[in-house]
């Protein structure tokens, strides 16, 4: 038990944001500072700081890529989300909705796989309950097989007119590859643009090969550095810098989100290889 060993700062990445609250509260009772790392600990005031990437900005970057690639009107749009138990999944979707909703409202995109999203398509801002309805219907649970199964079910339920050149909001790289595989296997899909997140090696290769359109690079070297800096700041008796707050259901948790980068075929060499994030020899087909 780290608390009985006398730690002064605890950095926690919660698998389940609400379930982690008990651990955070035990730490706080012992006078330990708690930093929530990447995912937010929910429903407790026992969180001193949140180190994360700007999850809303991630969703906005994904959606903006789809908007930039779309031409004309009536473009089929398929929406997918992360896990309903993960606060980040809501933030990603919030960011994506910020960008996509005006383009749904003006007819650029037509939602093809979510009656819940269609029902709120005229609303620029969604309540948490409205968003939960949408996320619950399009959740992949961050799982490759769940994502592929859902995509296949969506494609089976739609007609050839709902396909053609399609645009797909996929929440991360694992689900993006699964969904891309499903859409690539459908004879009525003539082309697809699909988003991703995390710059996983397999997805970087997919981008090089033209199987995945983009990913959002969240350089973990930056996040780790920011977490360590925050911990040291607490140990020195000071308070880390705050530019944002994130409400965890109990209060607004202070944070300073780290920057993210959109990556596609045009800048994959510079953003992923030249930056030292992944070595060139791990990939084939680089120019």
Language model region names:
Residues 1-287:
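A residue-level marker of the well-folded mature domains of exported/periplasmic proteins
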């Amino acid at each position: 038990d780290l608390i009985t060993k006398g730690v002064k700062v605890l950095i926690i990445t919660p698998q389940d944001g609400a379930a982690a609250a008990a651990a955070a509260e035990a730490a706080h009772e012992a006078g330990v500072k708690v930093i929530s790392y990447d995912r937010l600990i929910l429903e407790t005031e026992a969180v001193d700081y949140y180190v994360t990437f700007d999850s809303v900005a991630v969703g906005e970057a994904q959606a903006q890529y789809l908007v930039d690639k779309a031409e004309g009107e009536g473009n089929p749009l398929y929406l997918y989300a992360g896990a309903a138990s993960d606060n980040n999944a809501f933030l990603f979707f919030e960011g994506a909705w910020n960008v996509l909703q005006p383009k749904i409202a003006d007819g650029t995109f037509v939602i093809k796989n979510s009656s819940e999203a269609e029902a709120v398509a005229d609303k620029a801002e969604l309540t948490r309950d409205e968003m939960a309805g949408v996320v619950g219907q399009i959740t992949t649970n961050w799982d490759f097989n769940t994502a592929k199964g859902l995509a296949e079910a969506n494609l089976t339920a739609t007609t050839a007119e709902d396909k053609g050149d399609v645009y797909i909001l996929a929440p991360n790289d694992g689900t993006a590859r699964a969904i891309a595989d499903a859409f690539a296997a459908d004879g009525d899909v003539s082309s697809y643009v699909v988003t991703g997140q995390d710059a996983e090696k397999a997805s970087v290769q997919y981008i090089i090969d033209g199987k995945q359109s983009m990913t959002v690079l969240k350089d973990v070297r930056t996040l780790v550095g920011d977490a360590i800096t925050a911990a040291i700041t607490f140990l020195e008796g000071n308070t880390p810098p705050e530019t944002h707050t994130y409400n965890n259901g109990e209060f607004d948790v202070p944070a300073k989100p780290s920057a993210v980068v959109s990556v596609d075929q045009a800048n994959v060499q510079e953003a992923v290889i030249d930056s030292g994030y992944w070595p060139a020899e791990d990939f084939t087909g680089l120019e």
